[in-house]
Amino acid sequence: MRRGNGNFVFSGGFLSGTHFRAPNSVPATLSEKVYAGFKRDIVHGVFQPGESLSEKDLARRYGASRTPVREAAVRLQKDRLLRIVPNRGYFVAQITLQVLNDIYEFRTAVECASAELAAVKGASSQVIKELGNLAQVSCRPDDRGGCVRFIEADTAFHLGIASLTRNQMLYQAVNDARSQMERIMLAAIDIHYFGEVPKREHLDILCAIKDRDPERAHQTMHDHIMQSKDKVLGIAVVVPAHFARG
């Protein structure tokens, strides 16, 4: 595991070039930089759900003309992170109960299959060690920076498992869901402890993969995702201000 630009990066699997190579993490064009910055600001809560955003202000913020901002907005609408309302502007997408259910159903289908296939294909001791290091990262709810690092490590762990499948489509499917998942976790983590329990669950998943036990890998990933879903949906009911109905 290494860190670059403040982010955890899993260096095994796709990212090492052993199987498939992940998309370049460094945006190459101004349009990509605007998209990456805009997306990060939504995911990390700089822009709040439902907030109205001015194209002019966004162009100033990202040091670009309005054209790259428009291009980024179209992509973010496809990512379900932004709404474009004709003649009104841009609005940060709400995190609705429907979004929560959709993302967890998607993760259950895709990531359980990913863990199962990873156990079938196996991993080197170095990769297992690296994923184990990612699984050890935890945070306290009063440490915002630590929580962000925990969520980055969580993303790297799940992408690392997906990379072990040596299946580009599975990897991309897991990757596509992570922006929504990071956003959900950041919205929930302020009022719920996300530290030790996910660590134990991650280590259980990893142990099943190390033991080449696909059935157990599938089940432990399923249990992990369901535990996360129960926590977040519980928060959505108790503290509805964090999530919108719909």
Where are these regions (language model features)?
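Short linear motifs at protein or domain termini
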Residues: 1-120, 233-246
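Short helix-capping and inter-helix turn/linker motifs at the boundaries of alpha-helical repeat units
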Residues: 29, 129, 193-196
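C-terminal regulatory/effector modules of DNA-binding transcriptional regulators
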Residues: 2-4, 191-246
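Mobile beta-alpha loop/short-helix "lid" or hinge segments that flank ligand
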Residues: 78, 82-83, 177-179, 194-196
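Conserved amphipathic alpha-helical segments that form helical-bundle/coiled-coil interaction surfaces
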Residues: 103, 107, 120-187, 199-208, ...
